[in-house]
Amino acid sequence: VINKVVFFNTWHFGDLHSNKEYARQFLEEFNKRGIETCYATVVAGRAINLPVATQNVYDYPHLTGNPVTYFDAMSNTLYINTWIGYYIVMNSHNFTAQKEMWKDIAGKVLTASDGQIIISIDDDPMKYVSQIDNDLLSPVVIPEGKNIIFCNDIPISGQSHNGDWASAINRLANDYPEINFICTKIFENNYNNIYFTNNLTNREQIICDLPEIGYISESCDFIVTNSSGPGTFTMTKNNFINPNKTIVAFVIGEGNTFWNGVDGVLADTSWYNVYDDESVYQILRDKINAKIFHNSS
């Protein structure tokens, strides 16, 4: 008999967002049966609106080694590992891979409950593309005009090359003074049209501003990402189904684009396996000319 369920993730905050709708489905099923459920990370409370454990994941010594989802018969507790990297090999970090992971978790729930808890995962991953919980947001400031958001934090996973594109962004800001360039990682610059999310969100007063970054991205014409945590939070359903949105990912392989294998994406999406600032600059200059100014020069 399962008396308690603890979701945990010892690695990435971005996974909290991409897992959110799956975790909610499981939470609803557990709540129907009166099973106590929580997420063993303090960030989960405001990032994905799920109950948070009284202990952080690192206060569970048996979880820090990143074990597979398992059932502890002594405490009747099911521990569910939600880190995609444990289940899926590299080059498969996307919503389709998340679907396969949660199907596997559903099988473990079925076994741990002696066949009593059946959770069906829909084959359409678009149904699980996450949305931002606007009622949980702290105040944000969004610059007026055309906005491009750069999720240029250094990724801690292997899905992308390291680099913050500072040189490329500075050149673009010089070329296009009428466009606002919003960046998640701070770097040296002298342009009035470069903004940093730390200054647009209430970052100093909250645990993390990833949900706010996702919210800001929905007001941007372009999203430029590298599969970092902030980039993951910009992969929202509103962005996916917006035909006026352009999403560019600089990642190692197509499998690391979140839209890979997802039907119904209306945004203009593209990916590139490059990392040097010159290539990033040239690609984005061409994209901006074509999508915002509607010319190819």
Question: Where are the model-predicted features located?
Answer:
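Catalytic machinery of carbohydrate-active enzymes
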Residues: V1-S297
